[in-house]
């Protein structure tokens, strides 16, 4: 074979040209990213509790702190803002007084007031975690926490010797109801006779109310030996530790605070989601939506199992996670029967996202709600 110098010169020139173009595109891309973050963006965050609550509020605060330097953010918090008209004044203050161009309203009850505020401020990006409303400058996000709840139910069901499990919920909202149901289904998948007893505290953050609900459950059912919860209070974990029973946490992993009683936690991981949404706003590519993100999207997860779990628990959780990953299974695939014997989801069918998100008002078999 005879070499063709002109051919190879042409190929070499082509490679060099391609490299130059790629380099120019990379420089241009980096320039865009640098330009949109060169100016500090003020981000407002309001929630019903405190930023250091070791629970729901801190999960949001820590998420923003984790991306603050990369995106050149100034984070302004408004703590202990009630779910009601008072939130409007707090949001308006973040915009008018603090110059916030992104506002995150981290509680479900803010939603009914948020749409009107978003209409008045089209130049501001609004992000509503756990919400269910949208417009051009407003996006809501609900993680499929019920999937992590199902996994935590497996952990609780395998740990419970009595088959009696307590659950303290904040409000009978669809978000809380579907979590209780998923937890019960997970528990009963490994302990078919398991019973879940629920009491509502009617507050996200009131420690006294969470403690009263926890102690009332134990007074009524002294053989409860595992607690779980959907409140932004660590009180159910504290009560469990003081009574010498096990507990499952929520929002953040607090295993270090309860080394002898904690099993695992259903965690929120907001950082990557906030990063993506804030960048899309800065790039001018933001679209209001209602995002449903599951275990596969990384916004929810089950924290590492502690030394307190029953033998074989990790294998059972891993098997359930593989079922989720296969997309051939989700928690509310039929058959699902409610706690009065009515077939709610027939075999071969599944609940719609809309029903799970907005209209979940019944409880599955094995759940008893205490008055």
Language-model-detected regions and their locations in the chain:
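Extracytoplasmic "Venus flytrap"
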Residues: 43-63, 67-70, 76-85, 108, ...
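Periplasmic-binding protein-like
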Residues: 99-107, 127-129, 221-233, 248-250
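Flexible loop/hinge segments that line or gate small-molecule binding clefts
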Residues: 119-143, 252-260
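Hydrophobic alpha-helical segments within soluble ligand-binding/sensing domains
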Residues: 141-164, 266-285
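Extracellular/periplasmic Venus flytrap/periplasmic-binding protein
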Residues: 175-224, 229
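Extracellular/periplasmic periplasmic-binding protein-like sensory domains
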Residues: 240-314
């Amino acid at each position: 074979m005879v070499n063709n110098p002109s051919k190879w010169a042409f190929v070499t020139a082509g490679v060099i040209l391609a490299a130059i173009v790629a380099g120019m595109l990379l420089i241009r891309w980096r320039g865009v990213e640098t330009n949109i973050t060169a100016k500090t963006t003020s981000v407002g965050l309001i929630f019903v509790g405190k930023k250091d609550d070791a629970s729901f509020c801190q999960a949001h605060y820590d998420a923003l702190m984790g991306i603050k330097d990369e995106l050149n953010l100034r984070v302004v918090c408004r703590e202990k803002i009630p779910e009601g008209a008072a939130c409007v004044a707090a949001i308006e203050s973040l915009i008018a007084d603090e110059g916030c161009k992104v506002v995150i309203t981290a509680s479900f009850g803010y939603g009914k007031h948020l749409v009107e505020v978003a209409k008045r401020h089209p130049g501001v990006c609004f992000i509503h975690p756990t919400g269910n409303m949208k417009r051009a400058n407003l996006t809501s996000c609900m993680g499929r926490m019920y999937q992590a709840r199902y996994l935590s139910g497996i952990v609780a069901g395998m740990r419970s010797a009595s088959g009696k499990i307590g659950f303290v919920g904040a409000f009978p909202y669809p978000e809380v109801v579907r979590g209780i149901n998923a937890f019960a289904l997970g528990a009963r998948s490994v302990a078919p006779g398991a019973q879940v007893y629920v009491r509502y505290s009617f507050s996200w953050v009131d420690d006294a109310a969470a403690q009263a609900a926890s102690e009332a459950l134990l007074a009524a059912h002294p053989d409860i030996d595992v607690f779980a919860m959907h409140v932004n209070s660590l009180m159910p974990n504290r009560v469990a530790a003081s009574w010498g029973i096990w507990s499952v946490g929520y929002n953040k992993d607090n295993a270090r605070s309860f080394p002898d009683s904690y099993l695992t936690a259903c965690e929120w991981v907001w950082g990557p989601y906030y990063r993506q949404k804030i960048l899309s706003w800065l790039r001018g590519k933001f679209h209001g939506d209602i995002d449903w993100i599951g275990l596969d999207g990384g916004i929810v997860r089950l924290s590492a199992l502690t030394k307190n779990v029953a033998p074989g628990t990790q294998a059972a959780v891993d098997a359930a996670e593989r079922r989720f990953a296969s997309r051939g299974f989700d928690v509310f695939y039929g058959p699902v029967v409610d706690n009065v014997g009515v077939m709610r989801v027939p075999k071969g069918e599944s609940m719609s996202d809309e029903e799970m998100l907005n209209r979940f008002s019944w409880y599955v078999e094995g759940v008893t709600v205490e008055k």
